[in-house]
Amino acid sequence: MLKLPPRFFSVYSTLIHILASFLCSSDVRGDFPATRFDLGTLTLSSLKLLGDAHLNNGTIKLTRELSVPTSTAGKALYGKPVKFRHPETKSPASFTTYFSFSVTNLNPSSIGGGLAFVISPDEDYLGSTGGFLGLTEETGSGSGFVAVEFDTLMDVQFKDVNGNHVGLDLNAVVSAAVADLGNVDIDLKSGNAVNSWITYDGSGRVLTVYVSYSNLKPKSPILSVPLDLDRYVSDSMFVGFSGSTQGSTEIHSVDWWSFSSSFEESSESPPPMPNSPPPSSPSSSITPSLSTVRRKTADPSSSCRNKLCKKSPAAVAGVVTAGAFFLALFAGVIIWVYSKKIKYTRKSESLASEIMKSPREFTYKELKLATDCFSSSRVIGNGAFGTVYKGILQDSGEIIAIKRCSHISQGNTEFLSELSLIGTLRHRNLLRLQGYCREKGEILLIYDLMPNGSLDKALYESPTTLPWPHRRKILLGVASALAYLHQECENQIIHRDVKTSNIMLDANFNPKLGDFGLARQTEHDKSPDATAAAGTMGYLAPEYLLTGRATEKTDVFSYGAVVLEVCTGRRPITRPEPEPGLRPGLRSSLVDWVWGLYREGKLLTAVDERLSEFNPEEMSRVMMVGLACSQPDPVTRPTMRSVVQILVGEADVPEVPIAKPSSSMSFSTSELLLTLQDSVSDCNEVLAPISTTSCSSSEHDIFIVGKDRSV
């Protein structure tokens, strides 16, 4: 029996739906499909860039990076118009947008400007610089607009409350409503990534704005404004961002953006129009057109807007007959074409079942040219699964990072795991996978190249000391990424290899967590299966080493190790220099050392001595988070969502016992770590070591068989 693809039934049912709607539908609110997109799916051709706006490694830059203070403006708009008002009912659409942005500065004393989310009727209009934010002209002329501004300079001309506020602008840059961002501890000029959610309820006529450092939406909005949006928009508008500088060196970046809008009917319908049908039943929200058919049949007295319904019964019968014939003919053609396709299509290995939304597929020739035939001079790192090269694409000149998997059998598993996971993930602090190549028996993964390399290189190899604000921003970003993987994805994702060499840094030192080769998906609230433990010593939780079961709390332990490493500038496990003629000494645990200082009331003496400036209270809070995440008992460790809330000041610092708790296992955590590490070191002459993703790291990745499992 021929098995038809699900797509056939989808198309077939859609045609029936269209025919039924054509005959008798009077519901005009469903004429326009929802608009949905995000920055990860947009290309250069799908954006309209004006002025100084440009794309840089997947980030929208509204202003350029200039060392000399200037006044410039830029605007980036989604290239297609979006329906914001129904042409017949004039009712406004509901919409939701989320974006992550930052305001950085080459000269902290040179401030002035800002950016705004804008709804504009004109895709080619760019307003004046300075406080006008590219929204309108100095003369006051310009196209009408609706905008939510984030302003970094107090301008008396525009009645600004201060130089750190959010405001709603309606056809003018004098805000109709404004809120002080200091009330929620947000500083636009800090350089930190700021997240904003803007929603508009078309039925309730209310616009709300939420702002937070965390990627978790706050409970309360900073702005909630009654707004008749239909008074300020036309039927179709353009959405995007506008920004400007005002004699400053500010750089306005949008790292992530998602948008959706629709004309969905609310649960509380507005008063019915004359001669309109009564409010629909609950089922109408699922199948509105069919519900409309039932309503019209049940109520013959209701008027019909469709001209076809006013024709004679014979005309209606003719249309129905023709429609039925067309559907039958369509079904027959599809069945014939699909049967021929099955007969002549060879069975071949495909990644379609593994990857639902694949990134771009590169050719081997492209990558060979990009790396100068994989020249050793292009090598920028060696990982547990292969070598990483710097590449330059010949067609666009774009600089990329190419990961060349070293072992085909092992690399194939790595390839499928990494591609199927990263290909569908969207978060500003996750390393973006541009594409892949699977030719000539090789597997290659293509990523955005991070100008500042990995975090471990920034900590240990850079000639300049990584300042504390950058370190704090990095820790917050990684925590945000892990909270997303653990609690915001459809299936929970356990990374299993969180370490400083897997954290990459972009041009603004924003962190990008990468290397998903060891990651695993599980359903939320479901116990994971035991597997062979894998990862890097010093970052592995003790219970994971014994049971082989990776949970979100094992990632939390790894994150705790990263926190302490970043704060102290020391690796999780270190070995003292051996005395001449003697066997090297045992390695020491960073967690034990920091906990000992905490017990003595000298926690801040553990801080990296290269750090000349930092906030002691802030440093103490972060280090306490590191200790809380490093507790031997996984039950007592916080979740990553809690960690984010603690770091941004939305939750209190957890209580950490003065003395490190004893492990519930038969031996202490440090004893377990040190013994295993020494065992790995002793085998180096027999077994080939597996290096970390950083060339400079002295630790070794391990692959340890779980309890009661054999090699």
Swiss-Prot record:
This protein's UniProt keywords: ATP-binding, Cell membrane, Glycoprotein, Kinase, Lectin, Membrane, Nucleotide-binding, Plant defense, Receptor, Serine/threonine-protein kinase, Signal, Transferase, Transmembrane, Transmembrane helix
Compositional bias (Low complexity): 282-291
Q: Where is this region: Legume-lectin like?
A: 35-260
- Record field: catalytic activity: L-seryl-[protein] + ATP = O-phospho-L-seryl-[protein] + ADP + H(+); L-threonyl-[protein] + ATP = O-phospho-L-threonyl-[protein] + ADP + H(+)
SMART domains per the UniProt record, alphabetical: S_TKc (SM00220)
- Where is this protein primarily located? membrane
- What compartments host this protein? Cell membrane
- The signal peptide, as residue positions, is 1-30
Which parts of this chain are annotated as the region Disordered? 265-306
UniProt biased composition (Pro residues): 269-281
Report which superkingdom the organism of origin falls in: Eukaryota
Q: Note the InterPro entries from the entry.
A: ConA-like_dom_sf, Kinase-like_dom_sf, L-type_Lectin-RKs, Lectin_legB_Mn/Ca_BS, Legume_lectin_dom, Prot_kinase_dom, Protein_kinase_ATP_BS, Ser/Thr_kinase_AS
GO CC, any one term: plasma membrane
- Note whether Cell wall biogenesis/degradation occurs among the keywords: no
Main EC class of this protein? transferase
Q: According to its UniProt record, which protein family does this protein belong to?
A: In the C-terminal section; belongs to the protein kinase superfamily. Ser/Thr protein kinase family.
Q: What is this protein called?
A: L-type lectin-domain containing receptor kinase VIII.2
Q: Which organism is it from?
A: Arabidopsis thaliana
Recite the lineage of the species.
Eukaryota, Viridiplantae, Streptophyta, Embryophyta, Tracheophyta
